[in-house]
Each structure stands twice: as structure tokens, then as C-alpha cells.
Amino acid sequence: MTTDYYDLDDILADSEKLTCKFNITVPGLGYLEGNPGKPIHEDTKLELPHWLSGILATVAIDEDSNINFLDLADPDIIKEKVINAIKTDPLAVDLHKLTPYYYSLILKWGNLYTDKTLIANVMNCLKARSLEIYNFSNNANKTLNNEFLYTLDEFERALFKSTSDSNKSMRKWLKTK
């Protein structure tokens, strides 16, 4: 799961909006909140796409300052309630409902803020869910009307499709032997 300039899933993940708060008044950016030509004032809260908010959250106002243009609020996908649900039963969490690009956003968030506990919890979630995805891809009858498959984010859906296709190819190859 790498970032790719031409990957549509990566573009869609980058367009997910994050809540942020401006640390300074910025002249001329009022159009971001529907006020063209006006400034965005300090402490203004907005939802901006990840591609923009990520840059503004990591760039200092000037080289002598430790203050960034804005601070990002923790998105819902990493709030304690979601992480506790993932720790308790990763198979029961509807990642697609949280965001269709859950793992991509976690990866992008992890690049901004190093949080080893978050990464470990999400990796455990992916491991548990990958095993279940593999089990479903091996048994075509099991996939009919199964709620778990509707909870997969886009990365997991691609994993399911790839695994299913590989299993079909393997069965086809074994029949020729």
C-alpha cells in the first residue's frame, strides 16, 4: 500500500477531509470558508482535505518559529472508541463505514505523526481481518450474503479480489495436472 500520484484510491484518500484549527490569521484564504478576499482568523476550525491540511500542519510559519499554520484534530478513525473496538474484535468493526480508505488514511496519519501504538493496533486488525478475508476467498459459498464483506475498506476489497482470483487460478491449474 504505497502512495502513487496516479492511483485513484490514493487520490480519493487524500481528498478525505480532516478537522483543523488555524494557529494564525492568514490573509486572503477566506475562500476556504466561503468568504473570498477575507482572511481566515486564528482559531478558525475548518475541514480541509488531507493533502492540504497535512502540508499546513507540518510547515512552520517561518524558519525561526515552532508554530505551524494549523493543528489537526484527531480524526474519528483514530479516536479511542474506534481503537478499543478494533482491539476487542477487529472483525466486527465496519471500516468501510468509518471511511472507505481506512488503511490509506492511517498510513498517511502515521507519516505525519509517529504513533507506534496506533500502528501496532491497526496492524493487528489487518492481520486478523486478512485471515478472515483469505477464508472467505477460499469458499465461494461462504461469501453469499455475508455482512463481513460489506465492512471491508478499499484495500481489503482489493486484497479479497486478488486472493479470490489467485485461488481460482490455482484450482484451474490443479485441474490441468
Curated annotation (Swiss-Prot):
Component of the GINS complex which is a heterotetramer of SLD5, PSF1, PSF2 and PSF3. This is DNA replication complex GINS protein PSF3. CDD domains: GINS_A_psf3 (cd11713), GINS_B_Psf3 (cd21693). It is found in: Nucleus. One of its GO terms (biological process) is mitotic DNA replication initiation. The GINS complex plays an essential role in the initiation of DNA replication. GO terms for cellular component: GINS complex. Belongs to the GINS3/PSF3 family. Keywords: DNA replication, Nucleus. The gene is PSF3. InterPro entries: GINS_A, GINS_bundle-like_dom_sf, GINS_Psf3, GINS_Psf3_sf, PSF3_N. SUPFAM superfamilies: GINS helical bundle-like, PriA/YqbF domain. It comes from the Eukaryota.
